[in-house]
């Protein structure tokens, strides 16, 4: 892979609201290219706006019980979808250090560039 995929982790949002905030954020950046969003599972059905690929993982924390599904999903999205930016919704901010450790670890170090969420979404 020649370029790193920017990855933005949206934290501190609660389930239903957080998932829609992540989709809204991605939709605002569609002009830069295809966006991809990974959200924690929860009630209800989500519909991705045009230009946004959405994957909803099974309910549970993505860095604890959902660690393997998250890693597989990130790898597949980067390889197959090749998004201009990948957004990951994380509802509990106290899990951010563990998630960053996983994404900074072997397998992703040369493929992704972890970035802070744009100010308007914090």
Language-model regions, residue ranges each:
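Glycine-rich P-loop/Walker A and Walker A-like loops and their local beta1-loop-alpha1 context
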Residues: 2-31, 39
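A generic structural motif
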Residues: 11, 36-40, 59, 110-122
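Short beta->alpha connector loops
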Residues: 15-17, 68-70, 92-94
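Short, charged/polar "capping" segments at the starts of alpha-helices
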Residues: 17-18, 43-48, 94-98
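Phosphate/Mg2+-binding loops and adjacent switch elements
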Residues: 81, 93-122
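Conserved nucleotide-sensing/catalytic segment adjacent to the nucleotide-binding pocket
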Residues: 39-41, 46, 50-88
């Amino acid at each position: 892979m020649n370029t790193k995929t920017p990855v933005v982790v949206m934290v501190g949002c609660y389930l239903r609201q957080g998932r829609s905030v992540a989709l809204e954020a991605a939709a605002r950046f569609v002009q830069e290219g295809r966006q991809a969003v990974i959200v924690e599972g929860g009630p209800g059905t989500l519909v991705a706006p045009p230009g946004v690929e959405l994957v909803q993982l099974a309910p549970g924390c993505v860095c604890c019980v959902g660690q393997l599904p998250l890693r597989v999903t990130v790898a597949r999205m980067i390889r197959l979808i090749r998004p201009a930016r990948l957004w990951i919704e994380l509802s509990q901010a106290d899990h951010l250090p563990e998630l960053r450790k996983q994404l900074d670890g072997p397998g992703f170090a040369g493929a992704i560039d972890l970035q802070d969420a744009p100010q308007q979404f914090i």
